[in-house]
Curated annotation (Swiss-Prot):
The lineage of its organism: Bacteria, Pseudomonadati, Pseudomonadota, Gammaproteobacteria, Chromatiales. InterPro entries: ATPase_NBD (IPR043129), Chaperone_DnaK (IPR012725), Heat_shock_70_CS (IPR018181), HSP70_C_sf (IPR029048), HSP70_peptide-bd_sf (IPR029047), Hsp_70_fam (IPR013126). Belongs to the heat shock protein 70 family. Residues 631-640 have a biased composition (Acidic residues). Induction: By stress conditions e.g. heat shock. Residues 545-564, 602-647 are annotated as: Disordered. It comes from Halorhodospira halophila (strain DSM 244 / SL1) (Ectothiorhodospira halophila (strain DSM 244 / SL1)). Residues 614-624 have a biased composition (Low complexity). Acts as a chaperone. Disulfide bonds: none annotated. The keyword Transferase does not apply. Keywords: ATP-binding, Chaperone, Nucleotide-binding, Phosphoprotein, Stress response. The keyword ATP-binding applies. The modification Phosphothreonine is found at T199. This is Chaperone protein DnaK.
C-alpha cells in the first residue's frame, strides 16, 4: 500500500509531510522550499502556474492570479465576508449558478475547490518526487471552525486533485499532535492558538496517557474563518495608499498593478518588522501622472504597524475566552500554549497571547510546519505506521433544524466529540401529508435565518395518516471528518426512508467528475508541454555543442563530413520549434550519432585511441536522456577541447 501523505492546505502557504518510520518529514518542493505559496496563475497561452512561479508573476498578471481562495471555499456569493473580498481582490469573484462564490480568470469561471486542487496537485507531485512512487491518499487539514460546506468543498478539492481524502483533520488538532506525540510528563491541557493567512482558530486540547495509549481529546474549539494575515497586510496597504495620496495627491486604490506591488511590499514589511523596529517601503515607478513617474518611499515602524492592527489582534481574544468557557476551564488551567500560523511570529501577537494566558507560548513548534506534520502523523495512524495514538476531535458548530416560527432547534451541540449521532422525531402538520421538508442548519444563533443552511431534506413516501400521527425519526450523523450525513426511518413500519439532499450550495457529483477529468487532462497536457520543452532544450544544446566542435576542429573535418553534419543540424532546426516531440528527439539523436562519430575521429587523430569511442558512446547516451542530464553540452566538446589542447 502506498503512503498516505499529510497536507496543510493553507490560505497563504501550503505544506506537505510524510511519516518515515517513527519520524515525520516535511518535504521540500521543486523550488527547494518547505512551504509552497497557495497561489495559482492562469496565463494567456493557457499555461497554469502554481506556487512560487505563480506568485512571482502576480505583479504583471494580477487579474488572473488567484491567491487566498481558501477564504471563498464553501461560501455563498452573497455572504458579507465575500462581498468585502470582492472589493479587495484584484481577480474577479463571481456568482455561480448555484449561488456559490466562484472566481474568474482568463474568461473562465472556476469553483474555489477547482483552484485549490491545483495547489493540492503540487503537494501531491512534491511528495511523489520525494517518495519515488504514486500517491493517491491524503489527510488534509482545515480550520477547526470550518462548517460542513467548507469541509465538503475541501474534500472535493482533494478528489479533483486525484487524491482520496482519508480524513479531514482540524488544524489546531494537527498542531497538537505534532507537539505532543513525543512529549513525556503526564497529562496536560494545551491551548493551540492558530492565526494563519486567512483564518483564526483556538482549540483547547487535553493530552493524556490512557492504558498506554496517547489520547488527544479536543475539549472545545472556537474561531473566526475570516481573520488572518491577509487582513494584517490589508491594513498596511491601506496605510500606504493613504500616505501616498497625502503626499502625491494620487489614489492607488484603483490601480491593480500598483496594488499587487503594494501587497508584496506590505507582506515583506510585516515580516521584517517582526525582527526589526523600522523598515522602509521603496517602490520606484509605482505610478505616473502628467509630470512624470512617481516613486514611493515610506518609513514604517513596528509601533505604527501595531497601532494599525491592534483591533485585529484584540479580535483573537474573544474566541479564546469562548473556547476556555466551553471547556469549563480558566486561563490558569492551561499548561502550554502552542502558536501556529505565520502571523503568530508578530511580537504583538505573542505579547497578547502571553498577557491573556499568563505564560510565554512554546517556542519549540514550527508555526509554518506543525499542521502538516500533525496531518502526516494522523496519516500514519490511519496507515497503521503510528500505534497507540487516539484522536478525539469535536464538531465546531451546533447542528439542528428549523422548527415552527423560524426557530433553530439544536440536535447536536457544538464541541460534541465526533463521530457522533443525534436523532429527532418529526411528524406531519396536515392530514394525509405524504412528504415533509426538513431544513438543516449549522450555527449558534437562535433564529434559523441567521445560521448556515446546509440543505433541505425531503422525506417522501409517508403513508397517508391524520396529522401528528406519523413518527419519523431523522438521524444526524457526523463522521470523523466533521461532515454530516442524514438518514430517516418511519418508526411505525420500521422502514428506512430515502432522503434526497438538495444542497443549498456546493458542487454536484457531475461537476466534480468534470473537474477531475479536466485536472487529469491538464496534468497530461502539462507533462506533454514539459517534455516538449525539454526536447527543444536538448536539441538546442546538441546544435550548439556540435557547431562548437566543428569550429574547434576546423580543418580536421572534411568538406563532405562537414556538409553531412550541417545538413543534420539544419534538419533538427526545422523541427525543433514544432510540436512533434518524437520528431525533435529523433533528429537530435541523429545529430548526436554524427557528432559522436566526429568526436571519435578527432580523438583518434589526436591519438586518443579506443578510449574515444567509449567517450563518444557515453555522449550519445546522454543526448537521449531527460532533464536530469541536460548537460549535453558538456559531454563531448569539453573532451574535444582537451583533445585539441593535447594535440
Amino acid at each position: 500500500m502506498g503512503k498516505i501523505i499529510g497536507i496543510d492546505l493553507g490560505t497563504t502557504n501550503s505544506c506537505v509531510a510524510v511519516m518515515e518510520g517513527n519520524k515525520t518529514r516535511v518535504i521540500e518542493n521543486a523550488e527547494g522550499d518547505r512551504t509552497t505559496p497557495s497561489v495559482v496563475a492562469f496565463a494567456e497561452d493557457g499555461e497554469v502556474l502554481t506556487g512560487a512561479p505563480a506568485k512571482r508573476q502576480s505583479v504583471t498578471n494580477p487579474e488572473n492570479t488567484i491567491h487566498a481562495v481558501k477564504r471563498l471555499i464553501g461560501r455563498r456569493f452573497d455572504e458579507d465576508v465575500v462581498q468585502r473580498d470582492i472589493k479587495e481582490m484584484p481577480y474577479k469573484i463571481v456568482k455561480a449558478d448555484n449561488g456559490d462564490a466562484w472566481v474568474e480568470a482568463q474568461g473562465k469561471k472556476m469553483a474555489p475547490p477547482e483552484v485549490s486542487a491545483r495547489t493540492l496537485q503540487k503537494m501531491k507531485s512534491t511528495a511523489e518526487d520525494y517518495l519515488g512512487e504514486e500517491v493517491t491518499e491524503a489527510v488534509i487539514t482545515v480550520p477547526a471552525y470550518f462548517n460542513d460546506s467548507q469541509r465538503q468543498a475541501t474534500k472535493d478539492a482533494g478528489k479533483i486533485a486525484g487524491l482520496e481524502v482519508k480524513r479531514i483533520i482540524n488544524e489546531p488538532t494537527a498542531a497538537a499532535l505534532a507537539y505532543g506525540l513525543d512529549k513525556e510528563g503526564g497529562d496536560k491541557k494545551v491551548a493551540v492558538y492558530d492565526l494563519g493567512g486567512g483564518t483564526f482558530d483556538v482549540s483547547i486540547i487535553e493530552i493524556a496517557e490512557v492504558d498506554g495509549e496517547k489520547q488527544f481529546e479536543v475539549l472545545s474549539t472556537s474561531g473566526d474563518t475570516f481573520l488572518g494575515g491577509e487582513d494584517f497586510d490589508k491594513r498596511i496597504i491601506d496605510y500606504l495608499i493613504q500616505e501616498f495620496k497625502k503626499d502625491q495627491g494620487i489614489d492607488l486604490a484603483q490601480d491593480h498593478l500598483a496594488l499587487q506591488r503594494l501587497r508584496e511590499a506590505a507582506e515583506k514589511a510585516k515580516v521584517e518588522l517582526s525582527s526589526s523596529q523600522q523598515t522602509e517601503i521603496n517602490l520606484p515607478y509605482i505610478t505616473a501622472d502628467q509630470s512624470g513617474p512617481k516613486h514611493m518611499a515610506i518609513k514604517l515602524t513596528r509601533a505604527k504597524l501595531e497601532s494599525l492592527v491592534e483591533d485585529l489582534v484584540e479580535r483573537t481574544i474573544e474566541p479564546c475566552k469562548t473556547a476556555l468557557k466551553d471547556a469549563g476551564l480558566a486561563a490558569g488551567d492551561i499548561q502550554d500554549v502552542i502558536l501556529v500560523g505565520g502571523q503568530t511570529r508578530m511580537p504583538k501577537v505573542q505579547e497578547k497571547v502571553k498577557e491573556y494566558f499568563g505564560q510565554d507560548p512554546r517556542k519549540d513548534v514550527n508555526p509554518d510546519e506543525a499542521v502538516a506534520v500533525g496531518a502526516a502523523i494522523q496519516a500514519g495512524v490511519l496507515g497503521g505506521d503510528v500505534k497507540d495514538v487516539l484522536l478525539l476531535d469535536v464538531t465546531p458548530l451546533s447542528l439542528g433544524i428549523e422548527t415552527l416560527g423560524g426557530v433553530m432547534t439544536k440536535i447536536i451541540e457544538k464541541n460534541t466529540t465526533i463521530p457522533t449521532k443525534g436523532t429527532q422525531t418529526f411528524s406531519t402538520a396536515e392530514d394525509n401529508q405524504t412528504a415533509v421538508t426538513v431544513h438543516v442548519l449549522q450555527g449558534e444563533r437562535e433564529m434559523a435565518k441567521d445560521n448556515k443552511s446546509l440543505g433541505r431534506f425531503d422525506l417522501t413516501d409517508i403513508p397517508p395518516s391524520p396529522r401528528g400521527v406519523p413518527q419519523i425519526e431523522v438521524a444526524f450523523d457526523i463522521d470523523a471528518n466533521g461532515i454530516l450525513n442524514v438518514s430517516a426511518k418511519d418508526k411505525a413500519t420500521g422502514k428506512e426512508t430515502g432522503i434526497e439532499i438538495k444542497a443549498s450550495s456546493g458542487l454536484t457529483e457531475d461537476e466534480i467528475e468534470r473537474m477531475v477529468k479536466e485536472a487529469e487532462e491538464n496534468a497530461e497536457e502539462d507533462r506533454r508541454q514539459r517534455e516538449l520543452v525539454e526536447a527543444r532544450n536538448q536539441a538546442e544544446n546538441m546544435i550548439h555543442s556540435t557547431r562548437k566542435s566543428l569550429s574547434d576542429l576546423g580543418e580536421q573535418v572534411g568538406d563532405a563530413e562537414k556538409q553531412e553534419i550541417e545538413s543534420a543540424i539544419s534538419e533538427l532546426e526545422q523541427v525543433k520549434d514544432g510540436e512533434d516531440k518524437d520528431a525533435i528527439e529523433q533528429k537530435t539523436q541523429e545529430l548526436a550519432t554524427k557528432a559522436g562519430e566526429l568526436a571519435q575521429k578527432a580523438y583518434q587523430q589526436a591519438g586518443g585511441g579506443d578510449e574515444a569511442s567509449a567517450d563518444a558512446g557515453a555522449g550519445e547516451t546522454a543526448s537521449g536522456e531527460q532533464k536530469e542530464d541536460v548537460v549535453d553540452a558538456d559531454f563531448e566538446e569539453v573532451k574535444d577541447e582537451d583533445g585539441n589542447s593535447r594535440k
